Every structure is written in structure tokens, then in C-alpha cells.
């Protein structure tokens, strides 16, 4: 189940840039031929961001004027065999991307497991309005399908952090934590929904039946569920210069450490290890880890010297 093209760009937004996050799983055997027309359209209309093309479909986040984004979405939905993408709009005060990239990939979201096809088997979609009831159920185990640095600045109440650094690590985490999932309703969520398409397909392939995922991801939940009813705590990391968004998809005060690219909350910036443009507590912790590893190997402890 995919498709959310009926959702229109908010004409009342007073912010100059429209951000469109989209994906669609569909067989695209000639996907290489789609690259140049997409790149030309985006460049001609001042659109920036990233689009990924693979034999399994399309995925990406782009930004531009409302009119430019409408042209791009119309072009994408007209691609033979593709259909309507899962689509989410938000807005930004400044262009959140530096350039436009249209890339050819083996997967539109890289899990690294052969044979995973969300078009054949996928978890049950749960609308944002129904999500709270599912995750409040005592027989539900809630799994944050994102990476550790995303979890660190915001997640749903009671969600498990698999402590993965990339999506490729998730299959191994599932195999090592089967006992935590057995006999439970498994509710997964991610930023926009695409990682859960493959994650739920993978988990169902292991024999789990009660597998669910948040339709439209955190972004759709933050857009549709009122703050006073929300079970979301913190901010949602996004992969652009906005860094994170909150309820109503409003831009947050989270920033990036320019050294290690970790998200930093205002509280993180109070750390003694934070130096603007140089380092943060995360940088320090990673460096200390490398120093200890070097000492165990008998190497020079002055890493990088």
C-alpha cells in the first residue's frame, strides 16, 4: 500500500521553500533512463536535494518553490509503472540542501538483504490517529527503526532503541533479540516510512505475524496528531540542513556538530566538550574509545598525531 498524492502543498505556509519527502516501491527495470530527465527538470526549476533510483523504485527528499515541487511530483507520478508515491510535504525558511543529486543505486533504502520485497509482503499499516492505541497496548513491543543518533533526540514513549548505526545492522539485531519479540505485537516506526517497508517485510519473513508500522512515519504523525494527544517526545531528525522538526513539522533548535555530524540539542551544547565548529561530547567519547583501543593494541595513544 503506497500513495499519498492527493495531499496538496499547504497554500497558507508563509515559508518560501516546500520540502517533499517521497518514496515508491515499484518495478523499474529501465530506471537508468529516468535519471537525466529528472536531473534536468530539477536543475531547470531550482530544486535541490537527493533522489535515488533503483530497479525497486524511487526514494528521496527535495526542496524548492511550491510550483517547482508540483512540477516534479507530476513528472514522477507520470513515470510508467510507478504509481503514486508516499508523499509528505513540509516547509523551510531557507533552502535545506546545497545541491541536486539523482543517483542510481542497487536499493532505494539499503538493507543489504537479498529477496526483500515490500510489494509482496509487508507489515500492517497503522494510521497516525490509531498509533497511540497500538503502542499503549501492554502486549505491544515498539521498535524505533532509525539509527542511534536519531533516537537520541526524540522517540515514542517506551520505544526500544536497537542502537544501530546503519540500516544494514537491523537484521542482525532482530536475530539476536527474537526473544523480546516472540508472542508480541511488533510496532515499528521510522522517519517517513520507507525503512519500515523493508524492516517489516524482513521480520514477517522470519515467521512473525503481528507486525505493524506507522503509515507515513514520524513526519506524518507529527503533522496530524495534536501536540496535546502526542506520545512523541523530543524532535525528529531529518537528513537536511533543518536537522530536526517538531510537532506541526516546525523547524527545531537542534543543530549539527560540524565535526562528527551528530545532532546537538541546546542542552548538548552546554557540555564542556562542545566547541563551536570543532567538537562535541559525541566527538570526545568516540575519540576516547579510539584511544583506549589503541592502548590495548600497544599503539601510540595520540590518535591522529
UniProtKB/Swiss-Prot annotation:
Keyword Nucleotidyltransferase: no
GO biological process: tRNA modification
Record-annotated active site: 190 (cysteine persulfide intermediate)
SUPFAM superfamilies linked: Rhodanese/Cell cycle control phosphatase (SSF52821)
Annotated family: Belongs to the TrhO family.
Record GO terms (molecular function): oxidoreductase activity, acting on paired donors, with incorporation or reduction of molecular oxygen
SMART domains, alphabetized: RHOD
Organism domain of life: Bacteria
Keyword entries, A-Z: Oxidoreductase, tRNA processing
UniProt cross-references to NCBIfam families, sorted A to Z: PRK00142.1-4
Protein's organism: Brucella melitensis biotype 1 (strain ATCC 23456 / CCUG 17765 / NCTC 10094 / 16M)
Domain Rhodanese: residue ranges: 136-230
Protein name stated in the entry: tRNA uridine(34) hydroxylase
Function: Catalyzes oxygen-dependent 5-hydroxyuridine (ho5U) modification at position 34 in tRNAs.
A family per Pfam: UPF0176_N
Enzymatic reactions: uridine(34) in tRNA + AH2 + O2 = 5-hydroxyuridine(34) in tRNA + A + H2O
EC number from the UniProt entry: 1.14.-.-
Amino acid at each position: 500500500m503506497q500513495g499519498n498524492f492527493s495531499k496538496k502543498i499547504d497554500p497558507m505556509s508563509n515559508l518560501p521553500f516546500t520540502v517533499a519527502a517521497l518514496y515508491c516501491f515499484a518495478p523499474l527495470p529501465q530506471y537508468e533512463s529516468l535519471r537525466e530527465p529528472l536531473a534536468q527538470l530539477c536543475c531547470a526549476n531550482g530544486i535541490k536535494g537527493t533522489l535515488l533510483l533503483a530497479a525497486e523504485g524511487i526514494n528521496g527528499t527535495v526542496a524548492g518553490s511550491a510550483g517547482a515541487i508540483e512540477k516534479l511530483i507530476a513528472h514522477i507520478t507520470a513515470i510508467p509503472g510507478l504509481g503514486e508515491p508516499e508523499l509528505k510535504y513540509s516547509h523551510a525558511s531557507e533552502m535545506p540542501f546545497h545541491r541536486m543529486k539523482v543517483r542510481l543505486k542497487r536499493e532505494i533504502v539499503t538493507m543489504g538483504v537479498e529477496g526483500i520485497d515490500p510489494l509482496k509482503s509487508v507489515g500492517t499499516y497503522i494510521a497516525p490517529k490509531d498509533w497511540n492505541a497500538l503502542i499503549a497496548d501492554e502486549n505491544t513491543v515498539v521498535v524505533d527503526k532509525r539509527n542511534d543518533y536519531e533516537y537520541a533526540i526524540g522517540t515514542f514513549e517506551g520505544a526500544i532503541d536497537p542502537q544501530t548505526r546503519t540500516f544494514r545492522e537491523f537484521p542482525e539485531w532482530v536475530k539476536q533479540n527474537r526473544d523480546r519479540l516472540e508472542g508480541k505485537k511488533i510496532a515499528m516506526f521510522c522517519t517517513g516510512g520507507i525503512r519500515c517497508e523493508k524492516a517489516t517485510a524482513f521480520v514477517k519473513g522470519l515467521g512473525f505475524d503481528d507486525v505493524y508500522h506507522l503509515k507515513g512515519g514520524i513526519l506524518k504523525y507529527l503533522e496530524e496528531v495534536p501536540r496535546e494527544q502526542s506520545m512523541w517526545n523530543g524532535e525528529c531528525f531529518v537528513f537536511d540542513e533543518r536537522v530536526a522538526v517538531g510537532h506541526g513539522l516546525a523547524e527545531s533548535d537542534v543543530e549539527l556538530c560540524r565535526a562528527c555530524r551528530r545532532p546537538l540539542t541546546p542542552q548538548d551544547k552546554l557540555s564542556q566538550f562542545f566547541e563551536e565548529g570543532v567538537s562535541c561530547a559525541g566527538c570526545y567519547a568516540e575519540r576516547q574509545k579510539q584511544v583506549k583501543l589503541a592502548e590495548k593494541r600497544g599503539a601510540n595513544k595520540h590518535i591522529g598525531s
